[in-house]
């Protein structure tokens, strides 16, 4: 095993980059960068049925968007896709066959299904029963000849030691142990199409690439004993394994499911909605790990420096969309204006709102944004029809002082010339209404805000009125007075 730390992220090109896979990549990235090691990207594409066109490009593109870089990948190195390494796998399959540690299996899918059904009806744990048990060498040869004559293509199975014990000290979960008798019998290492199975190929790849640490989700725990069997059969030292806990939905307490519509689970979705990649990186880094303390906002460089594998959580990581949005808002609020405007610009352009007021509008709503696409609904006031009032807003506007407040404020606005109507002159007009009517606080500000914007909350009221313009503000107040 290599002395230098080498980790890998090995996705299958079967679709978009999910938040769970992004976390696996990110933790491997942080671990490698923290220790000055190598971060390797390898593509596991042996499952041809699930292969998605452009899946590999999508994975790498979204990892780059998150801010990760890598030392080795299919882009820079030959044979970093499993489909390009079939000769390598065959070499080790042939070795195991020659050493009697693996054998060709001619049992058909129909026979396997029938045996599983029998075992289930008998209340037995489903497992593969070696088809050659009880056969003499002559009978075995006749059986193989008969099957080959019938055109049956064999798989290759690894011979499992039923008495074997497979254990490791997990980086996250501590000591874990499996008995060979609980593995399910001899398992397939090469399919009928000549492709290796996942648990075989991954061992060959990790060994040849000198991977020192395998950090992955705990759904892979059941794969680990099978992989340890291959390491043992080939006489190789296994890497260190670390299995991160599940990600659960914070609202349901259950494993995060792609059917959970209250969460954004694919990195592509965050890109399309205009989240800052730094915010998404920060959020994912805290899913199952934390550096201690109360602070939650960290730059990529800080996370690399702080990352400590000993602080990987043993409890499930709760995916909280509200927390993601809170964190995103914090990043957008504190980002420079040019970066935020660049994120908002495509959404404004698509909505036909890239006007001379666009920069002012982004500046106005920047503190409220959780994602850049929100700039469109937030600016509806300036481009769309006046919104219907909510019940809470109607209740505010039902107060008997409202007509007085609106009428007097309207007079103050109308009295301002175009030159006098500036952002700085609006607040004094509101204070003048207070002085003239004796009405103050929420009873003063809230009716004006609702009459002008149709909302109880928003940016500073003078900013909204100034950007809306005197004429339109007066029009909105007139319309509201007519409804009272």
UniProtKB/Swiss-Prot annotation:
E.C. no: 6.1.1.17
Catalysed reaction, written as an equation: tRNA(Glu) + L-glutamate + ATP = L-glutamyl-tRNA(Glu) + AMP + diphosphate
Motif ('HIGH' region): 11-21
Keywords noted in UniProt: Aminoacyl-tRNA synthetase, ATP-binding, Cytoplasm, Ligase, Nucleotide-binding, Protein biosynthesis
Chain ranges for the short sequence motif 'KMSKS' region as given in the UniProt record: 255-259
Family, as annotated: Belongs to the class-I aminoacyl-tRNA synthetase family. Glutamate--tRNA ligase type 1 subfamily.
HAMAP family: Glu_tRNA_synth_type1
Protein name (Swiss-Prot/TrEMBL): Glutamate--tRNA ligase
Organism: Streptococcus agalactiae serotype Ia (strain ATCC 27591 / A909 / CDC SS700)
């Amino acid at each position: 095993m290599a002395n230098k730390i080498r980790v890998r992220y090995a996705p299958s090109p079967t679709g978009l980059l999910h938040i769970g896979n992004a976390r696996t990549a990110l933790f491997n990235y942080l671990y490698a960068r923290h220790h000055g090691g190598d971060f390797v990207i390898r593509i596991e594409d042996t499952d041809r049925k699930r292969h998605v066109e452009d899946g590999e490009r999508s994975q790498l593109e979204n990892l780059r968007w998150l801010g990760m870089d890598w030392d080795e990948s299919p882009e820079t190195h030959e044979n970093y896709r499993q489909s390009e390494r079939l000769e390598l796998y065959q070499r080790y399959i042939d070795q195991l066959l020659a050493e009697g540690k693996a054998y060709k299996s001619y049992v058909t899918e129909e026979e396997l299904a029938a045996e599983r059904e029998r075992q289930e009806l008998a209340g037995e744990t489903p497992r593969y029963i070696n088809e050659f048990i009880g056969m003499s060498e002559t009978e075995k040869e006749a059986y193989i000849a008969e099957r080959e004559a019938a055109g049956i293509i064999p798989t290759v199975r690894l011979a499992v030691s039923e008495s074997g014990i497979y254990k490791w000290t997990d980086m996250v979960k501590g000591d874990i142990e499996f008995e060979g008798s609980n593995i399910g019998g001899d398992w397939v290492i090469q399919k009928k199409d000549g492709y290796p199975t996942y648990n075989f190929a991954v061992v060959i790849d990790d060994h040849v690439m000198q991977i020192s640490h395998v950090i992955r989700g705990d759904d892979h725990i059941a794969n680990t004993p099978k992989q340890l069997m291959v390491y043992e059969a080939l006489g190789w030292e296994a890497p260190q394994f670390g299995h991160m806990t599940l990600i659960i939905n914070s609202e349901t307490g259950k494993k995060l499911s792609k059917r959970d519509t209250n969460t954004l689970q694919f990195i592509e979705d965050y890109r399309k909605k205009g989240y800052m990649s730094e915010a998404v990186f920060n959020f994912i880094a805290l899913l199952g790990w934390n550096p201690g303390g109360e602070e939650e906002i960290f730059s990529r460089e800080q996370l690399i420096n702080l990352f400590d594998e000993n602080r990987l959580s043993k409890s499930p990581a709760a995916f909280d969309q509200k927390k993601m949005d809170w964190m995103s808002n914090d990043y957008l609020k504190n980002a420079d204006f040019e970066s935020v405007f660049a994120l908002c610009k495509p959404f404004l352009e698509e909505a036909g709102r890239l006007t001379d007021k666009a920069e002012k509008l982004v500046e106005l709503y920047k503190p409220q944004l959780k994602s850049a696409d929100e700039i469109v609904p937030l600016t509806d006031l300036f481009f769309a029809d006046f919104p219907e009032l909510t019940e809470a807003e109607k209740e505010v506007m039902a107060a008997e002082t409202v007509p007085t407040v609106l009428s007097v404020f309207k007079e103050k606005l109308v009295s301002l010339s175009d030159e006098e109507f500036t952002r700085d002159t609006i607040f004094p007009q509101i204070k003048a209404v207070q002085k003239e009517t004796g009405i103050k606080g929420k009873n003063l500000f809230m009716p004006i805000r609702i009459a002008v914007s149709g909302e109880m909350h928003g940016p500073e009221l003078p900013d909204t009125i100034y950007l809306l313009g005197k004429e339109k503000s007066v029009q909105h107040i007139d319309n509201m007075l007519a409804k009272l």
